[in-house]
């Protein structure tokens, strides 16, 4: 519909937090170039970075949107996937309401049945909640569009209902529900640590801890010989690396350049969804490939 992306970059050195001053600089440059910036998208916990934004950072973002009159779109589909000790997910809705910003910020929050510990991707369930300073005419238009669309699939509606209203203490299935939930999340945490440790043991690789979501997003420092070769062949370094990794090991990753990483840096996104036993094999294959790659360009 003619929209234009204005990128901003997370601060990798500060656990992939949002640098609001940097975001403001990007906004001002876009406006100076004639772009009418209308909204900002925040993903928390992060994809592809696996970070969890602090309450302080979320409040900074909410105030920034209030000051700049930007619609705040908060993608929170990984809210159940939090693994870092002492950290918990806080919704942007809570941040906005607790700070008394609901008259200054229009917030759209998104959640899904595809992630979390339930992972019901094929059910196609999810919802959007509108909070705060929305123009009533805009809300009416959104409701009209929803009303004339086809009804959401029944299975998706059922799963959304179950996610929003899980078993409660005293109900027959409560103990089993808690055990299955806790076992799944504990296993994901162990897999996250195992894969992150394997990546950090590789030469030229730095992988920040995955506080949440389902991903590791390691930083790659490539040998200069390899960089020169890619430049000569007009190839993107992280794309070429991921392609070779796929062809030689069968491991599927996504180049960081596909996500709009900071210029001059290279990453790839990988998931720790395979079973704990399979993750060990992934780590071995990845290690062998990378060591061979480094040896080739030394």
Across the structure, where does each feature detected by a protein language model lie?
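PLP-dependent class I/II
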Residues: 1-298
């Amino acid at each position: 519909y003619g929209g234009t992306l204005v990128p901003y970059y997370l601060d990798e050195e500060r656990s992939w937090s949002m640098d609001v001053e940097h975001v403001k600089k990007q906004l001002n440059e876009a406006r100076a170039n004639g772009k009418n910036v209308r909204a900002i998208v925040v993903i928390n916990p992060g994809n592809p970075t696996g970070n969890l934004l602090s309450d302080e950072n979320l409040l900074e973002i909410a105030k920034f949107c209030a000051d700049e009159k930007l619609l705040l779109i908060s993608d929170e589909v990984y809210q159940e996937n939090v693994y870092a000790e002492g950290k918990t997910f806080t919704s942007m809705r809570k941040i906005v309401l607790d700070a008394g910003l609901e008259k200054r910020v229009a917030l759209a929050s998104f959640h899904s049945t595809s992630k979390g510990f339930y992972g019901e991707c094929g059910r196609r369930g999810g919802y959007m909640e509108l909070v705060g300073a929305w123009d009533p005419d805009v809300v009416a238009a959104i409701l009209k569009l929803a009303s004339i669309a086809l009804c959401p699939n029944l299975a998706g509606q059922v799963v959304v209902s179950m996610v929003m209203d899980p078993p409660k203490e005293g109900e027959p299935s409560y103990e089993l529900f808690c055990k299955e939930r806790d076992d799944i999340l504990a296993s994901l945490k162990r897999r996250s640590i195992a894969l992150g440790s394997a990546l950090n043991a590789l030469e030229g690789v730095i992988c920040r801890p995955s506080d949440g979501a389902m991903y590791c997003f390691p930083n790659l420092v490539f040998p200069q010989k390899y960089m020169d070769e890619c430049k000569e062949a007009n190839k993107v370094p992280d794309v070429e690396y991921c392609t070779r990794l796929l062809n030689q090991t069968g491991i599927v990753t996504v180049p960081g350049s596909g996500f709009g990483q900071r210029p001059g840096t290279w990453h790839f996104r990988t998931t720790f969804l395979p079973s704990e036993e399979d993750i060990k094999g992934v780590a071995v294959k990845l290690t062998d490939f990378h060591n061979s790659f480094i040896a080739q360009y030394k």
